[in-house]
Amino acid sequence: MVGCITDNPRLFLSRVDDSYRAGVDYVLGPWCFIGREEKFPTWEHISFQDAFENAVSKSIACDECSRLAASIIKILAVDLNQRHQRDYSFEYWWTLLIRPVLTTTQFLWRRWGTINSFIKKTHNEPLIVVVDPRTLDSEWKFKDTASLIYNGLQNEAFNYFILSLIIKALAPNTWTIVSTKNKLANISELPIPAVP
């Protein structure tokens, strides 16, 4: 007898709901239990997937993130000079852009690494993953670095959006990807600035 697809284990990218089955379903990180700790008290005993296998792979990732951030700033410097009809140096733009670019690069690299490591471990399993249907065309606007961090990188809906993009790009063909716009209550809302 062939099992129903709903019997397959699920991978939760964001907060678990009441249908979560401990020992059957997977969660990508501890953030999946925020506000649900009492409902699922054994969450603290789950071994979550790390983005890095060891200190060496973490060191390599740091170097790669730094190189990527530098190349992004070079591209942005040219674009911003043209847009504002200026001829500021790379160093000028570096000073202004390194913090948000490096912070974003590290965030994305870690999320990509976590998913990539998880896929290596579970690529043969018939998982079900519910993802955010939005694409890169979605607009997320941030006023400054603080807004980027609080309303983007630390925002549950934004994290779910980014993880969904990565999953949609990397998921093995054994996984069933289900798009839904109702996974998070604030999924269709733009972030509300937390800082003036």
Residue ranges of each PLM-predicted region?
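Catalytic-core helical/loop segments in enzymes performing group transfer/polymerization on anionic/lipid-linked
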Residues: 1-196
